[in-house]
Amino acid sequence: MEIGVFIPIGNNGWLISEAAPQYMPSFALNKEIVQKAEKYGFDFALSMIKLRGFGGKTQFWEHNLESFTLMAGLAAVTDRIKIFATAATLTLPPAIVARMASTIDSIAPGRFGINLVTGWQKAEYDQMGLWPGEQHYTDRYNYLAEYATVLRELLETGVSDFKGKYFQMTDCRVSPHPKDTKLICAGSSNEGLAFTAQYADYSFALGKGTNTPTAFGGVNDRLKAAADKTGRDVASYILFMIIADETDEAAMAKWQAYRAGADQEALAWLTNQAAPNAAAGATTNTAQLAAPESAVNLNMGTLVGSYENVARMLDEVAAVEGTAGVLLVFDDFVAGVENFGTKIQPLMTSRAGV
């Protein structure tokens, strides 16, 4: 099973809590994390893009770096690990993304990939006059399909003459063009999975629950059903937060403290911003992110326990049919990656030989 790290491009990582570690994003921090991940055999690093945060006492995600420029820097200071940036497709034309991908591929040949996101938080785009209107919630995958088509043509052939509703290319050219840039999509709704099966190479989905490592299995089944219709092979990667310590009790005490210290003002903002998109269906990523059960960490699957038990649960994840890998976040990234590499990974049968 492959292992990736979802690096903290925004302040405080993925814990919306006054009790969690409070820190600002920086190139130095992410360089330390990714170089450490490479040292311990991680397969890839991914950064998100966030253009407006949730506020609150912790100013959650009000401070963010930009994904492509950050990953270009990290590409230059690593040797093996794959590097994935996220394109906010409402802000970056596909031809510009293709040219940036060509540049980063020159820095790190064969190691770069692109995560495509449609955008769900209106405030991110409205602030700069780029929000297309409420119809975006229903039209977004039509838009993204055209975007991905243009991007694929430019990445694979260096030229596009695509003519569609949203994009019109006229002998648009990108050279040099990389030969094998992977595309990623994180949609988990039926519509999102259908898009992924048609246009992407990798699917990212949220794990579910606390210490329920196999609860996500249904999304793999739905992805396979969608991919069977397109005849394409799409790999499934699942997102989990790791909160580990020497004992189950110590790890659970941290998790309970994070939950007790939840930044309620920031969570209220998340709920408000997510509501229009969540209304599109219970299986959307946004509906899960904002669900009240564990919004403190955006409701991603959470594995809490001793190093031994976290290793065991990750092996259970690996055993779910269709799982190619996991994407990990940590409550404390520097210590978390170190402890994963030295205390968790050596106990995992699914990482034997790494």
From Swiss-Prot:
Its EC number is 1.14.99.46. GO terms for molecular function: alkanesulfonate monooxygenase activity; uracil oxygenase activity. The gene is rutA. Keywords: Flavoprotein, FMN, Monooxygenase, NADP, Oxidoreductase. One of its GO terms (biological process) is alkanesulfonate catabolic process. It catalyses: uracil + FMNH2 + NADH + O2 = (Z)-3-ureidoacrylate + FMN + NAD(+) + H2O + H(+); thymine + FMNH2 + NADH + O2 = (Z)-2-methylureidoacrylate + FMN + NAD(+) + H2O + H(+). This is Pyrimidine monooxygenase RutA. It comes from the Bacteria. Belongs to the NtaA/SnaA/DszA monooxygenase family. RutA subfamily. FMN binds at I49, K50, N115, E124, R140, Y141, S189. NCBIfam families: RutA.
